[in-house]
């Protein structure tokens, strides 16, 4: 029994890979159990049949691209700028509505303000000439 305690006291050490224990069943025959840390009783699989198949993520949404990232925004292009203001109040739509990136949203806002100050665009409403233009963004108006 002292040999068993001496052997099992070293189980916590990192370099020990084998441990043996003796168990007796009512004083009859001793059974020894051998445990090895990095070994299993099954053979290692050398083929790739159990590995997962590499594939694209089917739930990944396509990246949203900014509509105006490759375009130049000018304060004199009133028809383009009027797409980003409300037809009823003249308020500039935010990023969550227009879907623009932050840089282009700032450029659009500055261009609209500049066009309104210079008299190219009305301030309080959208110009009626541009009400039936095709929409650049997915902006839904109440009807």
Swiss-Prot record:
PROSITE patterns assigned: RIBOSOMAL_S18
Similarity remark: Belongs to the bacterial ribosomal protein bS18 family.
Gene Ontology MF term list: structural constituent of ribosome
Keywords carried by this UniProt record: Mitochondrion, Ribonucleoprotein, Ribosomal protein, Transit peptide
Predominant subcellular localization, coarse grouping: mitochondrion
Subcellular location: Mitochondrion
Cleavable signal peptide: none
Subunit organization: Component of the mitochondrial ribosome small subunit (28S) which comprises a 12S rRNA and about 30 distinct proteins.
Entry superkingdom: Eukaryota
Gene3D superfamilies for this protein: Ribosomal protein S18
Name of the protein: Small ribosomal subunit protein bS18m
InterPro entries given in the database record: Ribosomal_bS18 (IPR001648), Ribosomal_bS18_CS (IPR018275), Ribosomal_bS18_sf (IPR036870)
